[in-house]
C-alpha cells in the first residue's frame, strides 16, 4: 500500500484529538497537600504515587514526571517510594507576597497510556517576619507653646506575614509629656499618633527621646522598634537678664581712649533670634556719659571715648538696656557705676643739651660729654625723678643739682675696639607704680692716629726670573691700618739704599697707593742673585705712623749665557789651539784640554764636551772627556794616521734650550825628538821621572808660597778693617761660614749656621772672604795640614789610601779675585720660604764612562773655574759613615772637588797636591806589563806643562 504525504498529514490530524480526549478523561482527578514555608530539604509532603493510584514499579517505565508553572525545583518526587518532598527553601512572602491564598500547582504526567494529574500544594504561613518601620528614627518638631492633647501623626510599622502574624500592637516608652494615640481607619488599618499630655518648656527640656515598639500576633511574637526624636521649638517667652542689677568699676584717669571699662553679659534663655541680645544706653543717660563712653551693641563692651579727668568728674552712672530680637522683643536693665581714680599720669621728660660730639678717643677721664635735664609734672613722690645710664659703658652720670645731670667719661676709649656707643638714659619717678622715660644718645668716638700700618708678616720672599721685561710687576705688598679715614690711608714707598754702586730705586719701584712692586730694569742673575730691600708703609695721620717690611727678591737663573772658551795656552791660527803629539804616544794619553766657563749657574752652567769626528775617518784616534774637556788618544798612534788632525770640540751647557760653543784644536803628529811637550808626556814613567819634574816643582813651590803669603796678608787686612769699621744698617753678621757637603748619594747638608750675610745692596758685592771651618763633622776636611794627612777617615780611624792627584784649575785665578759667597755657588738657601737649589747627583755606583774622565758634577753649576781632581779609570766607592763623600763643593766658588778611591790593584800616578800655602809632592810609579803590549799610564792631575796656567 502506498501512502502519499497528504494521507499521512490527514491521519496525524485525526490522532491528536483522540489523545487529548484520553488525557482529559484520565486527569479529571486532583490532589491537595499543604506544607509550611521555610520547610527544610526532604520534608515529607505526601505519598503522591499512592494517592494517584499508581504502582511504584510502573513509575519509571511510564516515565513519571512532574511540571509546574512556578519554580519546578521547590518540590520533588522520589521514584523509588513515590513520596513528594521539599527539594529547596520555600518562602511564602517571596512566592505569593501578601496574598491570603498561596499554593503551588503541579501537573503529574505518565505515559503508556498518557495520563495527566493536577496536584495543589498549599504553602502555610509562619511568623518569620518581624514588624518593620520605614525608618530607624522619626523626628518630630513641636513648639513649646502647643497646648496639651495635641496629636502629632506617626508612621506605623508593617509585617510581611499574613493573618494573625501580621496583626500589630503599638507601645510607647514612658514619658510625662507624651502618650500614644491609636485609631482604626476605614480600611481596618491602625493610624497612630503622638499625644501631648503636658505643656512643653524648651528652656527646661529642649528635646525628648522616645521609643515606639510594634508587636505582631504570631507565636512566638516578633517586635520592631523606632526611635522618636522630639525637638521642642523655641518661642520668645524669656526676657534678657543680667547677673547683677548694678556694677561698679574703678578706672584710672589716664586711661587711653578705647580702654575697656567693663564687658556686660546679659543672658536670654531663648534661642535663635529670641536669644540674640543687643546692648544700648538707656534714653535717660546724661549727655556727659555719651561724650566719654561708648557701648558695643553686640558684645556689651563699654569703652572710653574721651579723656577722663579726676579733677573734673570722679563718678559716672550709666543705665544699660539689653533687648532681644524676638517678636515681640523683650528687654532687661542694669546700672554701671564708673569711679575715676587719681593716677601718676605724667611721665618724666628728658632734655639733652650741650652735646660735645664726637669724643676723641684720647679724651681725659671726667670729660663732659653732654648735659641732661629732667622734669615731671606730677607733685610729691610722683614728681621725684632719678636718672640711670646703660650699664657696661665707659661713661657715667653725675648729678650737678636737682633734675640736672652731666654725662662724663669714666674710662679710656678705643675706637678700634668700639667706634660708637648707643647710650640710653632712663628717668624714673617715685610714683607707685613709677613711670619712666628713656632717651637715646649716640656717642661716636673720633679716631686718633694711634695705630701704625701693619703687614701680615715681617718678611716676604719673592722669586723673579732674570731678564724680566722692564717695569714688570713682581709682587704686591699690603699693610692694614686699624685707624679710620685719613689715619688709615696707607701709602707705600721704597726705603732707599745703595746696591753696589747704584741706588736701589734704579732697580725697584713701589706704587704709592697699591703697593705693587715693579722691577724697573731687567735683572741679571749673574750680577745680582739676591736683592734685599725694605718697603715702608705710612698712613696720612698727624703725625704719620709707619712700618717696614723686608722683601727678599731672589733672581732665578736662566740660560742666557753661552759657554765661553778660555784663552788658549798657545796661540794658533784663527783662535785654534795647536798641539804637537808624538806618534809614539800610547792609548789613553791626554794630548790637550779644552777649557770653557759658563756665567750661568746650576744646570745652565753644567758643561759637557763632544768631539765632532771627521766623516772620512773610521778609526779616529782621539776622544774628548764628556765633562773634563780632556782630549786623549783612544789607541796607539801608528804611521797610517794623518800627520795633522783638526778637532772640533762642541761645548754645550744643560740649559733649556742648551747653548753651545765650538773649540778648534789642531793636533800635529811628530816624531818624539821634534816635540818637547810631547816627549815630556811620553817620558812620564821612564827611568828618571823625578828629574823631569824637579824644575817644575820648584816653580810650583815658589808660586804656592807667594799665593799663601798674599792670602795671609789679605786675611789680616780684612780682619783689621772689620774690627775697626763701625756697625752699619744691614751690615753682614760675622756668623760662622757654612761648609756645604754632598752625601754619597748627592744630598746636601748644612752647618747650624745656615745663612751667611748676603750683601745684596750692602756696599760692593762679593768682597768678603770666607774661611772654611774644620770642625764640621759631616765634612771632615782639614785645609792646610801637614803632609800625609788623611782626608777620608772612617769610624775606625784606619788610614786610607791617599787621594789621587789634585790639579789646580787654570781658571781658578779669576775666582781668587772675588770673595767666596754662598750665592756664587748656586746653593743659596734663603730665609723662611727661600730657595733651596739642589743640583743633579750621580750615584757612586755609576760606572765611569772612560779613563781620565770626570763624572758629572754633583751639586751646583760647574765650570772650569774650580778645583779639579784628575784620576784614572775606575768606579767610585761609596763612602762609609764618617767618611768624606766622593764630591764636595767649596761654598762661594763655582768649584767641584771630586775624590775618588782607586781599586786596590789599579795603577795610580800621583802628581802634586796644591793646598792653601802647603804642598805635598807625590811620587809617580810605573808598572810594566808582560809581553808586547803597550805600556798604559794613568795620570792624575794636570801635566807639568799645565802649571803655567796656574
Curated annotation (Swiss-Prot):
Q: Which residues lie on this side of the membrane: Extracellular?
A: 30-697
Q: Where is this region: 4 X 4 AA repeats of P-X-X-P?
A: 799-894
Among the GO biological process terms of this entry, one is: cell adhesion
Q: What is this protein called?
A: Protocadherin alpha-6
Q: Where is the Cadherin domain?
A: 34-133, 157-242, 243-350, 351-455, 456-565, 581-678
Q: Which spans of this chain does UniProt mark as PXXP repeats?
A: 799-802, 832-835, 873-876, 891-894
Keyword Disulfide bond recorded: no
Query: Which is one Gene Ontology cellular component term of this protein?
Result: plasma membrane
Q: Mind listing the GO molecular function terms for this protein?
A: calcium ion binding
Gene assigned in the entry: PCDHA6
Q: Does the keyword Calcium apply?
A: yes
Name any one Pfam family assigned in the record: Cadherin_2
State what this protein does. Answer: Potential calcium-dependent cell-adhesion protein. May be involved in the establishment and maintenance of specific neuronal connections in the brain.
Q: Which UniProt keyword terms apply here?
A: Calcium, Cell adhesion, Cell membrane, Glycoprotein, Membrane, Repeat, Secreted, Signal, Transmembrane, Transmembrane helix
Transmembrane regions: 698-718
| UniProt signal peptide | 1-29
Q: Which residues lie on this side of the membrane: Cytoplasmic?
A: 719-950
Stretch list, region Disordered: 830-950
Amino acid at each position: 500500500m502506498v501512502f502519499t504525504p497528504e494521507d499521512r498529514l490527514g491521519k496525524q490530524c485525526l490522532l491528536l484529538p483522540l489523545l487529548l480526549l484520553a488525557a482529559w478523561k484520565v486527569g479529571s482527578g486532583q490532589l491537595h497537600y499543604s506544607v509550611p514555608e521555610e520547610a527544610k530539604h526532604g520534608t515529607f509532603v505526601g505519598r503522591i504515587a499512592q494517592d494517584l493510584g499508581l504502582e511504584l514499579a510502573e513509575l519509571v517505565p511510564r516515565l513519571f514526571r512532574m511540571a509546574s508553572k512556578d519554580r519546578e525545583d521547590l518540590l520533588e518526587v522520589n521514584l523509588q517510594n513515590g513520596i513528594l518532598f521539599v527539594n529547596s527553601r520555600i518562602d511564602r512572602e517571596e512566592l505569593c507576597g501578601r496574598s491570603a491564598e498561596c499554593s503551588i500547582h503541579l501537573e503529574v504526567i505518565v505515559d503508556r497510556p498518557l495520563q495527566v494529574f493536577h496536584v495543589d500544594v498549599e504553602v502555610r504561613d509562619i511568623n518569620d517576619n518581624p514588624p518593620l518601620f520605614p525608618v530607624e528614627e522619626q523626628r518630630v518638631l513641636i513648639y513649646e507653646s502647643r497646648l496639651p492633647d495635641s496629636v502629632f501623626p506617626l508612621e506605623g510599622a508593617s509585617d510581611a506575614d499574613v493573618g494573625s502574624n501580621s496583626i500589630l500592637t503599638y507601645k510607647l516608652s514612658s514619658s510625662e509629656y507624651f502618650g500614644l494615640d491609636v485609631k482604626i481607619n476605614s480600611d481596618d488599618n491602625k493610624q497612630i499618633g503622638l499625644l501631648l499630655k503636658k505643656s512643653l518648656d524648651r528652656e527646661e527640656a529642649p528635646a525628648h527621646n522616645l521609643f515606639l515598639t510594634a508587636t505582631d500576633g504570631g507565636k512566638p511574637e516578633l517586635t520592631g522598634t523606632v526611635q522618636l526624636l522630639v525637638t521642642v521649638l523655641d518661642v520668645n517667652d524669656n526676657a534678657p537678664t543680667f547677673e547683677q542689677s548694678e556694677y561698679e568699676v574703678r578706672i584710672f584717669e589716664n586711661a587711653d581712649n578705647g580702654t575697656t571699662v567693663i564687658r556686660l553679659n546679659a543672658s536670654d534663655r531663648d534661642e535663635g533670634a529670641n536669644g540674640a541680645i543687643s546692648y544700648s544706653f538707656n534714653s535717660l543717660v546724661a549727655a556727659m556719659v555719651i561724650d566719654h563712653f561708648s557701648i558695643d551693641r553686640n558684645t556689651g563692651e563699654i569703652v572710653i571715648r574721651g579723656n577722663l579727668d579726676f579733677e573734673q568728674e570722679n563718678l559716672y552712672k550709666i543705665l544699660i538696656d539689653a533687648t532681644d530680637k524676638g517678636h515681640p522683643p523683650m528687654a532687661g536693665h542694669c546700672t554701671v557705676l564708673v569711679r575715676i581714680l587719681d593716677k601718676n599720669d605724667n611721665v618724666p621728660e628728658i632734655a639733652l643739651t650741650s652735646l660735645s660730639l664726637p669724643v676723641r678717643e684720647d679724651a681725659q677721664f671726667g670729660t663732659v660729654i653732654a648735659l641732661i635735664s629732667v622734669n615731671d609734672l606730677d607733685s610729691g613722690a610722683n614728681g621725684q625723678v632719678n636718672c640711670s645710664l646703660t650699664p657696661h659703658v665707659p661713661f657715667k652720670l653725675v648729678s650737678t643739682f636737682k633734675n640736672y645731670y652731666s654725662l662724663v667719661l669714666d674710662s679710656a676709649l678705643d675706637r678700634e675696639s668700639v667706634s660708637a656707643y648707643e647710650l640710653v638714659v632712663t628717668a624714673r619717678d617715685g610714683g607707685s607704680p613709677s613711670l619712666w622715660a628713656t632717651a637715646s644718645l649716640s656717642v661716636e668716638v673720633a679716631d686718633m692716629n694711634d695705630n701704625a700700618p701693619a703687614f701680615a708678616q715681617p718678611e716676604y720672599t719673592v722669586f723673579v726670573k732674570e731678564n724680566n721685561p722692564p717695569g714688570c710687576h713682581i709682587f704686591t705688598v699690603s699693610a692694614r691700618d686699624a685707624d679710620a679715614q685719613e689715619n688709615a690711608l696707607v701709602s707705600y714707598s721704597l726705603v732707599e739704599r745703595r746696591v753696589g754702586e747704584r741706588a736701589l730705586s734704579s732697580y725697584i719701584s713701589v706704587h704709592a697707593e697699591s703697593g705693587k712692586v715693579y722691577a724697573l730694569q731687567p735683572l741679571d742673575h749673574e750680577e745680582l742673585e739676591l736683592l734685599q730691600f725694605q718697603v715702608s708703609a705710612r698712613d696720612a695721620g698727624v703725625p704719620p705712623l709707619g712700618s717696614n717690611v723686608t722683601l727678599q727678591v731672589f733672581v732665578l737663573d736662566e740660560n742666557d749665557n753661552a759657554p765661553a772658551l778660555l784663552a788658549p795656552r798657545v796661540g794658533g791660527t784663527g783662535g785654534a789651539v795647536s798641539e804637537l803629539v808624538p806618534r809614539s804616544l800610547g792609548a789613553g794619553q791626554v794630548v790637550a784640554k779644552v777649557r770653557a766657563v759658563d756665567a750661568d749657574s746650576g744646570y745652565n752652567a753644567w758643561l759637557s764636551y763632544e768631539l765632532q769626528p771627521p766623516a772620512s775617518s773610521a778609526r779616529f784616534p782621539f776622544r774628548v772627556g764628556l765633562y773634563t774637556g780632556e782630549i786623549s788618544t783612544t789607541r796607539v798612534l801608528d804611521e797610517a794616521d794623518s800627520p795633522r788632525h783638526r778637532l772640533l770640540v762642541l761645548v754645550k751647557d744643560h740649559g733649556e734650550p742648551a747653548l753651545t760653543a765650538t773649540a778648534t784644536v789642531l793636533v800635529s803628529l811628530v816624531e818624539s825628538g821634534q816635540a818637547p811637550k810631547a816627549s815630556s808626556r811620553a817620558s812620564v814613567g821612564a827611568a828618571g821621572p823625578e828629574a823631569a819634574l824637579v824644575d817644575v816643582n820648584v816653580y810650583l813651590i815658589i808660586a804656592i808660597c807667594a799665593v799663601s803669603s798674599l792670602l795671609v796678608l789679605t786675611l789680616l787686612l780684612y780682619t783689621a778693617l772689620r774690627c775697626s769699621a763701625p756697625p752699619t744698617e744691614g751690615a753682614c753678621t760675622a756668623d760662622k761660614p757654612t761648609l756645604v757637603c754632598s752625601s754619597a748619594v748627592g744630598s746636601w747638608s748644612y752647618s747650624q749656621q745656615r745663612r751667611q750675610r748676603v750683601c745684596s745692596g750692602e756696599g760692593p758685592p762679593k768682597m768678603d772672604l770666607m774661611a772654611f771651618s774644620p770642625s764640621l763633622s759631616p765634612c771632615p776636611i782639614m785645609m792646610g795640614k801637614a803632609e800625609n794627612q788623611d782626608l777620608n777617615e772612617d769610624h775606625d780611624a784606619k788610614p786610607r789610601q791617599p787621594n789621587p792627584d789634585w790639579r789646580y784649575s787654570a781658571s781658578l785665578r779669576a775666582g781668587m779675585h772675588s770673595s767666596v759667597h754662598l750665592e756664587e755657588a748656586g746653593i743659596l738657601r734663603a730665609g723662611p720660604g727661600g730657595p733651596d737649589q739642589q743640583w743633579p747627583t750621580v750615584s757612586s755606583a755609576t760606572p765611569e764612562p772612560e779613563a781620565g774622565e770626570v763624572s758629572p758634577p754633583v751639586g751646583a753649576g760647574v765650570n772650569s773655574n774650580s778645583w779639579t781632581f784628575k784620576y784614572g779609570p775606575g768606579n767610585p766607592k761609596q763612602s762609609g759613615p764618617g767618611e768624606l763623600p766622593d764630591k764636595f763643593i767649596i761654598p762661594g766658588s763655582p768649584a767641584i772637588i771630586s775624590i775618588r778611591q782607586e781599586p786596590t790593584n789599579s795603577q795610580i800616578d800621583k802628581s802634586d797636591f796644591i793646598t792653601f800655602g802647603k804642598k805635598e809632592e807625590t811620587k809617580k810609579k810605573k808598572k810594566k806589563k808582560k809581553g808586547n803590549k803597550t805600556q798604559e799610564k794613568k795620570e792624575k792631575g794636570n801635566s807639568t806643562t799645565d802649571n803655567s796656567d796656574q
